[in-house]
C-alpha cells in the first residue's frame, strides 16, 4: 500500500472522530443545561423533561458514533486502496 494513502487515511480517521464529536458535545451540554433550567423552573414537569432530554441525547450521540464508524472504515476497510 502507498504510504501516503495510509498516512492520509489515519489523519482522516482522526479528523472524522474529532470533528464528529465537537457538535454533539456542544449540543449535549446545551441541552442538559436547558433541561436543568426547565426542571428548576417547573419541578412538576421533571419526568417529561427528563424523558425528552434522554431521547435527544441518544440522537445526538448517534452522530458521534457515525463518525467513529467512518473512522473505523478508513482504518480497517480502506476504500482508497
From Swiss-Prot:
PROSITE patterns: ATPASE_C (PS00605). GO terms for cellular component: chloroplast thylakoid membrane; proton-transporting ATP synthase complex; proton-transporting two-sector ATPase complex, proton-transporting domain. The record marks 61 as: Reversibly protonated during proton transport. The keyword Ion transport applies. Gene3D superfamilies: F1F0 ATP synthase subunit C. It comes from the Eukaryota. It holds the Pfam family ATP-synt_C. Its main location: plastid. In plastids the F-type ATPase is also known as CF(1)CF(0). This is ATP synthase subunit c, chloroplastic. It comes from Gnetum parvifolium. The gene is atpH.
Amino acid at each position: 500500500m502507498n504510504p501516503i494513502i495510509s498516512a492520509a487515511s489515519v489523519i482522516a480517521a482522526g479528523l472524522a472522530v474529532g470533528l464528529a464529536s465537537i457538535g454533539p458535545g456542544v449540543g449535549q451540554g446545551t441541552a442538559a443545561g436547558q433541561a436543568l433550567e426547565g426542571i428548576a423552573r417547573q419541578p412538576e414537569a421533571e419526568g417529561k423533561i427528563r424523558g425528552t432530554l434522554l431521547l435527544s441525547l441518544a440522537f445526538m450521540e448517534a452522530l458521534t458514533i457515525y463518525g467513529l464508524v467512518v473512522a473505523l472504515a478508513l482504518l480497517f476497510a480502506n476504500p482508497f486502496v
